[in-house]
Design a protein with these regions (language model features):
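DHp/HisKA dimerization-phosphoacceptor four-helix bundle of two-component histidine kinases
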Residues: 17, 44-51, 129-132, 159-166
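N-terminal leader and targeting sequences that precede the mature domain
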Residues: 2-62
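Conserved alpha-helical segments that form or flank metal/cofactor-binding pockets of metalloenzymes
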Residues: 36-103, 165-179
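Absolute protein N-terminus
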Residues: 1-2, 183
Length: 183
């Protein structure tokens, strides 16, 4: 059983609270979203957030999850397979400008020919709210990682942070494809 320092335990509690809020929001927003694609995206990300919450609970209980890093990589691999295939096709077609981003090609967010419908405006609001959450949570993990003495704990938290960044990429890609980014 691992004994966390007071600071480490406090950081884990903070991260747990953030993950709990993410789980609740993704579940609620999956119900509120109008677009079936967005409902599925929210539900999928929400499931990942449940795993993050379980990991943090285990850590708070003094258990070091043994497979967390591998599970994160496997989950990201499964979620990212379609994106990687599409990215490969894009690279073959010579598309540029997405260096460092493994998300699929999206149109210029400022090039929407029609205004957003009221339903799309509501979906855009949900996406913007969750994107802001993902940015905040990812930054929280980034700061927290450096406060842990255990390399294994840092690795686990780093894996979760990477997943949070991927969620942000997925939300951005959806928003940009639907003319919602900057709307």
């Amino acid at each position: 059983m691992i004994q966390w320092t007071q600071k480490e335990a406090s950081l884990l509690q903070d991260l747990k609270g953030q993950e709990q809020l993410c789980v609740e929001k993704y579940n609620e927003y999956a119900q509120r979203a109008h677009d079936p694609e967005l409902k599925n995206l929210f539900a999928s990300i929400g499931e990942t957030e449940v795993g993050h919450l379980k990991t943090l609970n285990d850590m708070l209980n003094g258990q070091m999850p043994q497979q967390q890093g591998q599970q994160q990589q496997q989950g990201q691999g499964q979620q990212g397979q379609g994106q990687q295939q599409q990215q490969g096709m894009q690279n073959q077609q010579g598309q540029q400008g997405q260096q460092g981003c493994q998300c699929q090609h999206v149109p210029d967010p400022g090039q929407r020919s029609q205004p957003l419908t009221p339903e799309m405006q509501q979906d855009a609001y949900l996406c913007k709210d969750l994107l802001a959450d993902e940015k905040y949570v990812s930054a929280s993990y980034n700061t927290s990682i450096f406060e842990f003495s255990s390399p294994q704990a840092r690795q686990i938290l780093n894996g979760i942070q990477s997943a949070e960044q991927k969620h942000g990429e997925q939300l951005y890609a959806y928003m940009a494809r639907h003319g919602m980014y900057g709307a």
